[in-house]
Amino acid sequence: GATDSRYILAAEITKKLSQNEEQEVLKLADDFEKARNEEFENLHLSAKEARLRDKTLHPERYPSIATEQKGWFMYEINPLNMIKNTDTIEFVSPDVCGIKCLPSSFQIIDAENGTLRTWVCDSHKSYIYTPQNLQEGTLIRIEDPDYISGKIRDTGR
């Protein structure tokens, strides 16, 4: 469809995780890290050296894990468009209007293993972790990098 909005709808918060559910996600992350370290320790010396070189050349292949952040809340999200961990995101709902959240104030967590993702998009099961206390159904938007004021873009949909 045509749009002249400066924003892209990026995701919807579908569920606020309970403290127990948050702890399960953090345990999943911890278990993943332990398994990754154990696998590394069981490698042959030359394989360890190769892994360390690869980690230096391609750090994105070895994501950090989520760790507890005091005072933060974890939410299951339904991603609709790409969100990057370098984006400034905004939360919008009936009780909040455009709360900006800088990249340092949120994390994207992979729901399968508890690692921190650098990006997420449609069909990636994931969580947003942030100090913002939000309600279910809150929308997450990002600024459209292709936005031009006064120009309506037709995507052909």
Model-derived segments and their meaning:
Residues 1-157:
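Surface-exposed amphipathic alpha-helical tracts and adjacent flexible/coil segments at the periphery
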